[in-house]
Amino acid sequence: MVIIQTLLSSFFIWCIIIAFLGMLQGEKKSAGSSEKNTASNDKAENFSRFAVVICAHDEENVIGNLLENLQSQNYPAEKFHVFVLADHCKDGTVKKAKAFANVTVWQRTGGERSGKGAVLNWGMEKILQKQNGFDRVLFFDADNQIRPDFLQHMNDAFAQGAEIVTGRRLTENPFDSLISQWYTLYWAVVNSLYNRPRQNLGLSSMLSGTGFAFRMELIRDSGWKTYSLSEDIEFTFLENLKGHCVTYLNDAIFYDEQPVRLYVMWTQLRRWCTGDFQIAFRYFGQWVKAFAKKPSWRLWDIFMGVGMTVFFGLTAVSYLIHGSLLIWQGQFPLLAVSTLVSYAATIAVGFAAAAKSSWPVKKLLPGILTFPVFYSLFSYISLQSLFFPQKKWVRIEHKSSKMHF
């Protein structure tokens, strides 16, 4: 049992090692850092032309905030155009989006509403057909809000050679509930202990659904084609197989509304886990061929990153079985110690992530002290998704208020 636990835990151990080495390495300037190459972007010909893509399904409550943010960018208006992909919208999303200049709204009414991946497959094909000279594609969800310098930072990153860039996701509603606190800590872990260390080590970061961009030539011939419920992770995985690395841009900050209720959290995490399983089953053979042909730490790391979610539930089961055996053998002190160590370690991770992300630790203390509960639920959801995968995309309602920058 100990051997099985060690094998399953190897994914988490690997991530801990990378996080530790990345922090020891020290800060490597991200492409597009505010301290680099600002002078070279004074001339208009050095500005990339962005196709800004927003997926929306009944988002009239929030999409106006993002569109206002885009109009307030410190970036030439003629160098980007917004495409709103309105998927089976029955509210005022289309009307609200059309009221903004520099915005094209396409309404998808055919077929069933099957999630963002299908909408992007449809919308990106239309954008590619237009041939309007776009250099980059930038993706947002309708509930996002962005700082005025977001596009400028993205442009700087591409000017310095980046191929795929992801920004730093922060929570719009960090203190609304215990659930939103957990999400705030989770994204702090992703930013500070997953993506940033990999940036420092020259490995690939992971896309996370929104707030990312890439060079148009990556899909100009093949188009955008994803099949899983986690189109962001799928795109990351496929591009890494082709040799394209994801750059993490700490200065490109965007905000995302997080769930506040357990049911909504459960639904979202189940979709993520189902998508990761779909990716693992579909592309494992391709990964083996790519790694055998040209082994690299980058390919190994991206496999471990996806595998961590895949084996999350199995790891929890192994520890549950191990704990049951300890109880049956009467080794209660050993069980208590191992449980407390695991609990304390997870709290320490939450505390470190919050501190490194400059969140007020005192205000997040309820979330930090119960962070192990979040990961315990996450592991159960992962196991549930393995045997009972989520079949359809489920909408999450957004109600976030406007932020002021």
Predicted features and spans:
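A conserved acidic beta->alpha catalytic loop
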Residues: 86-94, 110-112, 145
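Juxtamembrane C-terminal module of membrane proteins
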Residues: 20-48, 285-302, 325-405
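Cell-envelope/extracellular polymer assembly enzymes that use nucleotide-activated donors
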Residues: 48-51, 81, 234
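Long helical/loop segments within the catalytic core of UDP-sugar-dependent glycosyltransferases
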Residues: 109, 113-130, 149-228, 270, ...
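Acidic donor-binding/catalytic loop of UDP-sugar-dependent glycosyltransferases
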Residues: 92, 140-157
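N-proximal low-complexity "stem/linker" segments adjacent to membrane-targeting elements
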Residues: 1-68
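Short, acidic, metal-binding catalytic loop of nucleotide-sugar glycosyltransferases
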Residues: 68-79
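Acidic helix N-cap motif at the loop->helix transition within catalytic regions
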Residues: 64, 91-99, 107, 116, ...
